[in-house]
Amino acid sequence: MTAVTPTLPAPIGLLAELTHRCPLRCPYCSNPLELDKRSAELDTATWQRVLGEAAALGVLHVHLSGGEPTARQDIVEITGACADLGLYSNLITSGVGGALAKLDALSEAGLDHVQLSIQAAEAGNAERIGGLRNAQPQKFAFAERVVALGLPLTLNAVIHRGNIDEVPALIDLAVRLGAKRLEVAHTQYYGWAYVNRAALMPAKPDVDRSIRVVEEARERLKGRLVIDLVVPDYYAKYPKACAGGWGRRLMNVTPSGKVLPCHAAETIPGLAFWNVQERALGDIWANSPAFQAYRGTSWMKEPCRSCDRREKDWGGCRCQALALAGDAAATDPACSLSPLHAKVQALAVAESALETAPDYQYRTIGGAPVVPQPEGVSA
């Protein structure tokens, strides 16, 4: 079978990481270990230009993220730019700090949707996971105002060892807060989550139980609450298509303007990431070496190259392949066809069986923690 690079589709989504500043310190944060400082952030005019270029390129959805996007003083102007350009805007927020104070203005500026993170259903556990006291009352007040304004609300709950027993309570909480959608997203182990893997890894029986709870709730709450489920890679049979396939559907613009094919792409050595301060977004999408590196199937090795699923999962996660197999072009070890798959599952079982989970290494703007990186499973 001949490997091909498919005709370049237009990107659908843009993840606009407006800032890495955030009042929460979640140990599973997908931001890089080396966080951009405020002084490096793009200014308002640059973000407005980037959004205009995104609309011209064919982008439909803009996810205003961070860090905490409402930490930006110009978040209302940026949201208004999305509305003026006909871009559907989704605010991905912690709901704490100054988020509530800006919510009415964001709604008036044309905000379309809110995604609110919830660390746990129980307040004390939520504070322990997020590293911030009194976060839960702020989140609940924020959610109440979102619903009062008539904005659709999605709750996002990242699931791990520390909160997996709360999945039923999280579902009840989503209903109580008036959310239209709940994302039960098991931790993806890159960024800070990779550092904290041993502290976060749940046991397989607990994962299976959480899946059954979600499936039952989907039937019970049909028409009231949509529940999305993201299963943990380390226990999966096949990998997910990272970001819909490398360089196929999504772009991620960092606070300092680098354009990435996915959150964790900077962990892959040798990739050159072009910056919106130097090049147009369309040029980056079409010609950036980083986007071309793993776009399509021509880069694939066996068994991916001849696999019937190669244009479904697009080889899985390149960053995970690097972290676990030591080769970004290797088969994602989350795939059952990888020669390392059994080792990955054994690693997950071993870490989840630790009698006492390690302490969290909390996300910090000051730089990467000085702790040993987890080992991969390369042969």
Curated annotation (Swiss-Prot):
The keyword Repeat appears for this protein: no
Alphabetical UniProt keywords: 4Fe-4S, Iron, Iron-sulfur, Metal-binding, Oxidoreductase, PQQ biosynthesis, S-adenosyl-L-methionine
SUPFAM superfamilies the record matches: Radical SAM enzymes (SSF102114)
Gene Ontology terms: biological process: pyrroloquinoline quinone biosynthetic process
Keyword flag Chloroplast: no
Cofactor field: [4Fe-4S] cluster
Segments forming domain Radical SAM core: 8-220
Binding site for [4Fe-4S] cluster: C22, C26, C29
Record-listed E.C. numbers: 1.21.98.4
One Pfam family named in its UniProt record: SPASM
Molecular function via GO: 4 iron, 4 sulfur cluster binding; cyclase activity; iron ion binding; oxidoreductase activity; S-adenosyl-L-methionine binding
Reaction(s) this enzyme catalyzes, per UniProt: [PQQ precursor protein] + S-adenosyl-L-methionine = E-Y cross-linked-[PQQ precursor protein] + 5'-deoxyadenosine + L-methionine + H(+)
NCBIfam families the UniProt entry points to: PQQ_syn_pqqE, rSAM_more_4Fe4S
Subunit details: Interacts with PqqD. The interaction is necessary for activity of PqqE.
Annotated function: Catalyzes the cross-linking of a glutamate residue and a tyrosine residue in the PqqA protein as part of the biosynthesis of pyrroloquinoline quinone (PQQ).
HAMAP family: PqqE (MF_00660)
Annotated protein name in UniProt: PqqA peptide cyclase
